[in-house]
From Swiss-Prot:
Organism placement in taxonomy: Eukaryota, Amoebozoa, Evosea, Eumycetozoa, Dictyostelia
Signal sequence, start to end: none
Subcellular location: Membrane
Chain's gene name: abcA10
Species the sequence originates in: Dictyostelium discoideum (Social amoeba)
Protein name per UniProt: ABC transporter A family member 10
Short name of one Pfam family: ABC_tran
Residues that bind ATP: 519-526
Entry-linked PROSITE patterns: ABC_TRANSPORTER_1 (PS00211), ABC_TRANSPORTER_2 (PS50893)
Family matches, as PANTHER family: ABC TRANSPORTER A FAMILY MEMBER 10-RELATED, ATP-BINDING CASSETTE TRANSPORTER SUBFAMILY A ABCA
Length: 887
């Protein structure tokens, strides 16, 4: 089904937001925990707030000598003296010689406190006079001190002022010892150190810990399971992915913040004097910094459990630093540079506001926007958010082009490169990818050969006569994929040696072609697929997909349509088959929901498309089954259906038949054959039967090099593998016939097929055949076993044997091969290159008619399988490696 894909930022954002919401619904326990975790913290905070007794700390003040400067402090007083002592109070105040403008009277202490609350910075101290009697030497007063004022000697200054004035009025000239009866800090505090001062700074920064862990678990799991990267291969923009995470986390955090604030205000842990908007904005800014930290860690950590543990440890450490500063360093130093450095950690900047809030709540004061501590906290939180998101962008870009390996391939100064910004804004010249470089015919596959000096010694090896497609005169419009000296190297983490995963590979694949990529584990198949889909960056060389470079135009390649069936199952355990198809279809921009009747039609089209896609892989009956309940084969079929969404022109299938039964494999082969027109398909597989059935071209890789490439028949001819003819002589002939019993047959056979060869084991089998009976040499029994095992291996082809005539149908196979009682028939094998059916039929008919003449007991013929080609290539590679000198 062909569909017009509308890949836009908006459509992809809607698709991912829908996925996130659906995932939240599916994971109900985690979602409920995420929304209630903050309330659990706050409930503990409320309990501690109301159960832990206040710790009272008394400040000690020592008097200072007379003459200590007293100017500059406004005098606020309250008169509680009897009416007959009013004149005594006025005399005392006038004798202080303070300017009248600095003396302010309040009718009572409550009015003084209210004035202080409205503007704490305007009132430094206050005095409440209770009794002034000069005759009886009585001066009774209370000093109310602003506890936020930094000069702790102010109490002594005020005491000295009034005691010295009182002494002058009395005419006292000698030193008078005065006992200070009481000191009361202003306003009247319940404690000097309250629960709020500590618990806010400790508990509230941990409010978003669980939310941070959930962000990391989700994003790291999607990267670890390759879900994110497959989405990117299908056209997902990196920015859309992270914007979705920010939006989802912000919504989650806002709900958490509102719930927490309701609990705090409802339980009166916070008074209404604290502006709720200020508190909300502080929480919100701090939550943004946590999201940025989560994005940074998600790019650096490989497993969800490790990410969760690291985030917890990191946040606890930062909260500890914040507490150390607020409760210890702050009272020891007033260094602004130290504060600035610490406030670059958002828990420390947030802790500054929380400490101020706790003190104000303790003193029943209003926390104002103009307060320096509030301003500094807001300023540094904004700076932290900008800094953290910049670091997150930098880390993301470093790992962006090699996320399948989670390793750095870009330069650490990539942002200083002009080419980087050109690629960001699509300013790169199109000339670099407008025309494809032509392959050198001499380099099509033989680029991996040894030096010229060694070529002569291996001239006869089929590996030195590679058969490749991709001639230089191919029409560029017909080329789907072209690899040009593509190379990928790694550093072995243990030996530190350079490993060539893909070693200078060059070939082309035409449109409408299926290329089966074969090789042992570690041969470079997956690395090649990874470079073609952009999940791994090439070390050198390039590849062109529909004329676009994988190094410079990967975004365009993905936009134009590329399907990937990753070797891992890119599935969400909680989603059903239908939900997976719907998600990836929306990412591709298919059937985007609209309003009204048009929207209804698109939803109907989406439902029909889901049924069609699942029908192609025979999963309609599993439409509403969660993927975690599917078998391994069903998961692979679902992944294949996902890769076909949007009718991509390029299909990269990495082990699509893994875990499939024979019936499912046959069904997948038929599906790919139907989808093949106008598509370029590369599939890797270890199922050689499927490769032979599907592959228009078959490429065999070993040690990162292309060793052979061509159609199945071409490869068999290249390695002299077409048919295997097996003839058997009865064991009784060893006593009657001369040793050249097969000479007459071979003369006939090689006249018919002069390019055929006989098995190397034939000569040994003939020698053993006669030695057993004529010499009765027991030592040759071991040779018999060797010969029979070789011939058994040679005749163990998977195809159905064509039995022309069997003169002893009742004999057991093992008895025929001489494994019983040390006796066996003589078995000889001959290899024929691929021949037409008519030639083979004519030959077999003639051979059958002359079977008695040649004294042949049995004739069989099998067709060579791709397994034998694969084994030939592997054997040749092993021999070549053993011949190489070791350093």
């Amino acid at each position: 089904m062909t569909n017009n894909c509308k890949i836009t930022f908006k459509n992809q954002l809607k698709a991912l937001l829908g996925k996130a919401i659906l995932l939240k619904k599916k994971k109900r326990k985690e979602t409920i925990t995420e929304f209630t975790q903050g309330i659990q913290y706050i409930i503990v905070l409320v309990i501690l707030h109301y159960t832990i007794p206040n710790v009272i700390t008394l400040n000690t003040y020592s008097p200072v000598g007379l003459g200590y400067p007293t100017s500059g402090f406004p005098l606020c007083y309250v008169s509680n003296v009897p009416f007959n002592q009013t004149s005594n109070l006025h005399l005392l105040l006038n004798s202080t010689q303070l300017p009248i403008s600095q003396i302010v009277q309040f009718p009572n202490e409550q009015s003084l406190i209210d004035s202080y609350k409205s503007n704490p910075q305007s009132i430094t101290y206050g005095i409440s006079f209770n009794n002034i009697d000069y005759q009886n030497n009585i001066l009774d007063y209370n000093i109310l001190l602003n506890s936020t004022f930094q000069n702790t000697q102010l109490i002594s200054i005020v005491q000295n002022l009034f005691l010295s004035t009182f002494a002058e009025i009395k005419g006292i000239t000698t030193t008078t010892t005065t006992t200070l009866s009481s000191i009361e800090e202003f306003p009247n505090l319940t404690s000097s150190v309250s629960v709020s001062s500590y618990l806010y700074v400790i508990y509230l920064p941990l409010l978003f810990l669980f939310s941070l862990q959930q962000l990391l678990v989700t994003s790291v799991t999607e990267r670890k399971n390759h879900i994110k990267e497959v989405m990117k291969v299908m056209g997902l923009k990196e920015l859309v992915y992270w914007v979705t995470i920010i939006i989802v986390q912000t919504i989650t955090n806002v709900i958490n913040i509102l719930l927490v604030m309701v609990v705090l205000y409802f339980t009166k842990t916070l008074t209404t004097s604290l502006n709720p908007v200020m508190l909300f904005l502080q929480f919100l800014l701090y939550s943004f910094s946590m999201v940025a930290i989560g994005i940074i860690l998600s790019n650096l950590v490989d497993t969800p459990k490790t990410a969760s543990a690291i985030s917890s440890f990191l946040l606890l450490i930062l909260v500890g630093v914040s507490c150390f500063y607020q409760f210890y360093l702050k009272s020891k130093t007033s260094s602004s540079w130290l504060r600035s450095i610490l406030f670059l950690f958002s828990p420390c900047a947030f802790g500054e506001f929380l400490y101020k809030m706790g003190n104000d709540q303790q003193m029943m004061l209003t926390t104002n926007w103009s307060d320096p501590q509030v301003k500094i906290s807001f300023l540094f939180l904004i700076i932290d958010i900008f800094l953290y998101f910049t670091i997150a962008w930098y880390i993301t870009e470093l790992y962006k082009d090699n996320t399948d390996e989670n390793s750095i391939t870009k330069s650490f100064t990539f942002f200083l490169s002009l080419s980087y910004w050109k690629s960001i804004f699509n300013l790169r010249s199109s000339s670099s990818s407008s025309s494809l470089p032509l392959l050198n015919n001499n380099n099509n596959c033989n680029n991996n050969n040894t030096s010229p000096s060694s070529s002569s010694s291996s001239q006869s090896s089929p590996l030195n006569k590679p058969l490749l497609s991709g001639d230089s005169d191919d029409d560029e419009n017909d080329i789907g994929i072209r690899l040009v000296n593509l190379k990928k190297t790694y550093k072995n983490p243990i030996t530190k040696e350079t490993v060539n995963a893909v070693n200078d590979v060059s070939y082309t694949i035409k449109k409408g072609t299926i290329l089966a990529l074969l090789g042992q584990n570690g041969s470079g198949k997956t690395s090649t697929i990874g470079m073609l889909n952009g999940m791994r960056s090439p070390s050198s060389g390039d590849a062109f997909i529909n004329g676009l470079s994988i190094k410079y135009d990967m975004d365009k390649i993905r936009e134009n349509g590329i399907g990937l069936c990753h070797q891992s199952n890119i599935l969400y355990d909680e989603f059903t088959c239908a939900e997976h198809i719907a998600l990836y279809s929306r990412l591709k921009g298919l059937f985007v929901d609209g309003g009204g009747a048009n929207g209804d039609n698109k939803r109907i089209m989406m439902d029909n498309f889901i049924m069609e896609s699942l029908g192609e892989v025979n999963l309609v009956d599993k439409k509403d089954t969660q993927s975690i309940k599917l078998s391994g084969g069903m998961k692979r079929r679902l992944c294949l259906a996902i890769s076909l969404i949007g009718n991509p022109s390029i299909l990269l299938l990495d082990e699509p038949s893994s875990g499939l039964d024979s019936l499912s494999q046959h069904m997948i082969c038929e599906l790919l054959q139907r989808k093949k027109p106008n598509k370029t398909i590369i599939l890797t597989t270890h199922n050689l039967d499927s490769a032979e059935l599907l592959g228009d071209k078959i490429c065999i890789m070993t040690s990162g090099k292309v060793k052979a490439m061509g159609s199945s028949l071409e490869l068999k001819n290249q390695f002299n593998l077409g048919y295997i003819l097996t003839i058997v002589y009865d064991k009784s002939l060893s006593l009657l016939q001369p040793p050249n019993i097969n000479q007459q047959f071979e003369s006939f056979f090689f006249n018919k097929f002069n390019d055929s060869t006989q098995s190397k084991q034939n000569l040994k089998n003939i020698q053993s055949f006669y030695n057993i009976f004529n010499n009765n040499n027991n030592e040759n029994n071991s040779n018999n076993s060797d010969g029979s095992s070789s011939s058994s291996d040679s005749s163990s082809s998977k195809d159905v044997l064509l039995n022309i005539k069997n003169n002893n149908n009742n004999n057991n196979n093992n008895e025929e091969r001489g494994f019983s009682s040390g006796q066996r028939d003589l078995e000889l094998e001959y290899s024929l290159t691929h021949q037409s059916t008519d030639v083979i039929t004519e030959f077999l008919e003639e051979l059958e008619s002359r079977q008695d003449e040649f004294k042949i007991k049995r004739i069989s013929m099998s067709m060579t399988t791709l397994d034998e080609v694969f084994l030939k290539v592997s054997e040749e590679e092993t021999i070549n490696k053993n011949k190489q000198p070791t350093s």
